[in-house]
Amino acid sequence: FLIEEIKSDTPTSNWLTAKSGRKKRCPYTKHQTLELEKEFLFNMYLTRERRLEISKSVNLTDRQVKIWFQNRRMKLKKMSRENRIRELTANLTFS
């Protein structure tokens, strides 16, 4: 088994050492989360205008708000699925 050294001028080494263009992950503050959750209770889907309003009020980008809502809908879907499974297994166990 032959292992070659990665030369510093190869595309592979450039890829390995390249810095990601993404921003550092920054968790939401309690205030931001509370405001986003409150809005989610009223609307699971936002219009662009509403998303821009919310993003300004909680000091986030509209993209961050959009992604937060996408993730929150997926979380709700997952929780709903888990509850249905739990109910089915409970019914099978006790019937």
Swiss-Prot record:
PROSITE patterns: HOMEOBOX_1, HOMEOBOX_2. GO terms for cellular component: nucleus. Residues 21-80 bind DNA. Pfam families: Homeodomain. It is found in: Nucleus. Keywords: Developmental protein, DNA-binding, Homeobox, Nucleus, Transcription, Transcription regulation. SUPFAM superfamilies: Homeodomain-like. Gene3D superfamilies: Homeodomain-like (1.10.10.60). GO terms for molecular function: DNA binding; DNA-binding transcription factor activity, RNA polymerase II-specific. InterPro entries: HD, HD_metazoa, Homeobox_CS, Homeodomain-like_sf, HXA10/ABDB-like. It comes from the Eukaryota. Its main location: nucleus. Sequence-specific transcription factor which is part of a developmental regulatory system that provides cells with specific positional identities on the anterior-posterior axis. PANTHER family: HOMEOBOX PROTEIN ABDOMINAL-B, HOMEOBOX PROTEIN HOX-D10. Belongs to the Abd-B homeobox family. This is Homeobox protein Hox-D10. It comes from Gallus gallus.
